[in-house]
Amino acid sequence: LVASNITVNTSKNTVLNGAIFTDYTIDSTGKSSRLDLALTDNSTWNMTQNASAKNLWQGSEAEGNFVTDLSLNNSVIKFGHLDWNNDNELLEAQKAENFKNLYVAGNYSGDNGQLHMNVVLGKDDSATDKMIVGGDTSGTTYINFKNIGGSGAQTAQGIKVIEVLGNS
């Protein structure tokens, strides 16, 4: 294992499709890999799936898309779509276990950024796409939710779609 550092800066109307995975395993020198992602000028990341590999996140194994630092400047992340059958029911393969997770180990900044997320509007523990930021957040980001079959319900704590472990 060799730690590497990658920075991806997109420009006008760039489209990324798929999953992103950064291995945070610490190598023999005490370093881990970094992937800094900056989406700018109407760029889009279509997060079509969770990365198939699992990573350690806050001491526990987690499955999802992993980046180190993330910034959205007039750009959008679309947390994929869920498929329905002809009876307006979720296909079995598209149920709660297939919602997307985005882990940002470091900091997140938004400058007119957008997140398009899927959520079942129901109780506190409703299935949802999630974004978890290990560091700090700053700026302005708009979140668009698509209700995936939820009929609404009383919540005590709300449905957690974004969690920030640092300052916000």
Descriptions of predicted regions:
Residues 1-140, 146-147, 151-168:
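Extracellular beta-solenoid/beta-roll
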